[in-house]
Amino acid sequence: MLSRPLRVWCILLSLAVTGGGRSSAAEPVAAPRTAPLALTPAEYNNTIADLLGFPRDGDRWPARPAIADTLSPPRAASKGVFVPPPPPPVWPWRFPAEPGSDGFEGIAQGQNPSSYQVEELHHAAMHFASFALVSPTFFSCATWATLPATQQETCAWMSLERFAERAYRRPLRAQERERLEAFWHANIAAGPRDQAVALTVAGILQAPAFHFRVEPGDASAGDTTAGLSKWELATRLSYFLWDSMPDETLFAAADSGQLATTEGLERHARRMLEDPKARPAIVHFHHQWLGTDKVLLVAPARRAFGPLFGISPRLDNARDDDLKWPAIMGPVRHSMQLETELFVEQTIFDGAGTFNALLTDNHGYMSDATAPIYGAHATRIPARPTVTRTIEIVVASIGRRQSLTLYPAEFPRNERAGVLTLPSVLALGAYAVQPGPILRGKRVLERLACMDMGAPIQGAEAALPPDTLTAESTNRQRTAAATSPAACTACHKLINPPGFAFEHYDAIGRWRAQDNGQPVDASGSLTLRGGEEITFTDGIDFARKLATSNRVRDCYVLHWTRYALGNQLEETAPGLEALQERFRENDSIKELLVSIARSDLFRMRPTGNPGDNR
């Protein structure tokens, strides 16, 4: 049985979905219809920052207004054993992660509401509402706090009306305006004006029209497809390329009808890709594609890698707490994450900008924390600027913040080639001591070739070779032996070869020529779905061949199209093949995103109820 807050939420959503339709000519191609998309945690926080006119950096927000404590108690910091850690920043709000679909958030089929999520949305709304009082963009008058009471109320209402339209990403409907005004007057009657403003903002931030992207489209009677309305197109485009709401320019373009043509959509898509907000949004997609959004959870063992970072492999006394290894691994993990982000951003926005470069470029970033992983052959590039970020690490349950500087670098061409040889990707495909060819191979097949390998058979994990430093053979030989039974071969003849391609990299992503005293064998061959065969000598050769594979490029297009629509499209979805053929000929990633924005799949949707066209 649904909890009370969840039942209320569902009722409100049903009211929002039944808005009036409009009319337009039908188009032949549209993606299957889904339930309304909820804002993801990243989209919610970005939208809040843009709505209130604050930067996407909690350290640069103002302090919580004094009135905030009357609406919402401050979030408690996690408690340390010895010294309390600093309190969490006022932004972003930390929501529970979405279940996701195929590794991606923001996909309708992977969004499952919960009572806990609804409660967190309420807490977040109450927390952020008071910031409207100190927002540089909220009030439509310059000096609201010093105005006479009547003028304050007039200005506040005008500001709330404008705020609601921006929050809902469309003009208010007459009934919405009436309800909002009644809510505002009830709050004014109940308490001080600043509190009334904050409570009304909190109500707006809890409305389904804010939290959900409802897309009824412009449907004529009898049409099987409907063009999205101008406001829906603006919203879909902004969350596709920015992970946030439209800016004033895009709102104006929607209002004037500029988005009604593919040329208008293309013009604004190109403008938006040049905006700084596109960079973190595109990086965010690639974190989900590669799984590197989980890199802060990797746990290489001290007994295997302690000496690499200048400490003994074991504690001097078994009763001692290990304080050194967490202090080392905290910056290493964060550096891995930032190196991934900077590589993707620089390659797409400041480099070649192609899928080929994404999988083959041997430039990137490193820090003092990860320098031991890259080794002596990595060359820093002093002509390019360094990047310094603040990170948070936890040692002995004590949180602390420190700076981390990353340096542009060039790596040997026989050791690094694109995202698949980043330490973040390699460490995620490993155990505490040994690399995991099965983990790495499965990731390549599923994320790069769109080949779902399913779950392992019962007891498969128990048959894996032990994750130990002492072994009589190479990691490849042990894995091959463990997966040789007849019950395993059907899957592992596909999974093992792409995993073995990266045997030159240990569990932390360091390149190695030998494994257990024997030369590494990273060669192999693989037949992708559709019959495309790839033969390779090592991970570098494999990455270069994947970069030009039609199957792999088609898969990348499929991931991006699903992400843009928030819909787990089938591989055979109408309209998809044209996008894939174009990307085979021109692998510019920006051009792919523009092509998706221009497509019927992006601009249209079926009429009828969700599921009718699936």
Regions found by a protein language model. Name each.
Residues M1-R7:
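Positively charged n-region of N-terminal signal peptides that target proteins for export
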Residues L2, G19-R614:
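Low-complexity, glycine/serine/threonine/alanine-rich intrinsically disordered linker
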Residues V8-T18:
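Bacterial N-terminal signal peptides
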